[in-house]
Swiss-Prot record:
A Pfam family annotated for this UniProt entry: SUI1
UniProt protein name: Protein translation factor SUI1 homolog
Presence of the UniProt keyword Protein biosynthesis in the record: yes
Keyword Membrane: no
Cross-referenced PANTHER family: EUKARYOTIC TRANSLATION INITIATION FACTOR SUI1
Disulphide-bonded residues: none
Family classification: Belongs to the SUI1 family.
Alphabetically ordered keywords of this record: Protein biosynthesis, Translation regulation
Matching NCBIfam families: SUI1_MOF2
A GO molecular-function descriptor: translation initiation factor activity
Annotated function: Probably involved in translation.
């Protein structure tokens, strides 16, 4: 007898929710802010989904200066350009990009809270 309600544990993919569709079938333009564990207490904050016409290098430079952390822009095949910052900067990044006028508050999805 097999119980189909039991979920089999699988590996966690932090980018699995990147393509979210609404009721009309079109994808919403969300900016996803996630955290990934590295080794030990070290973590990495990723910002994905910013508009392509924005200057990622200027945004990264301002983020690094405002948050006092190191970071880089990574070009991913599936996700496009992703900003990576050292440390848990989820709240700081979300408030920064709203105050800078890059995106609106309702366009941000903060994951892993």
């Amino acid at each position: 007898m097999v119980d189909s309600d039991i979920q089999i544990p699988t590996s966690f993919d932090p980018f699995a929710e990147a393509e979210i569709t609404d009721a009309t079938g079109s994808t919403k333009e969300y900016v996803h802010i996630r955290i990934q564990q590295r080794n030990g207490r070290k973590s990495l904050t990723t910002v994905q989904g910013l508009k392509k016409e924005l200057s990622y290098d200027k945004i990264l430079k301002d983020l690094k200066k405002a948050l006092c952390c190191n970071g880089t822009v990574v070009n991913d095949k599936e996700l496009g350009k992703v900003i990576q910052l050292q440390g848990d900067q989820r709240k700081n990044v979300s408030t920064f990009i709203v105050q800078a006028g890059i995106v609106k508050k309702d366009q941000i999805k903060v994951h892993n809270f």
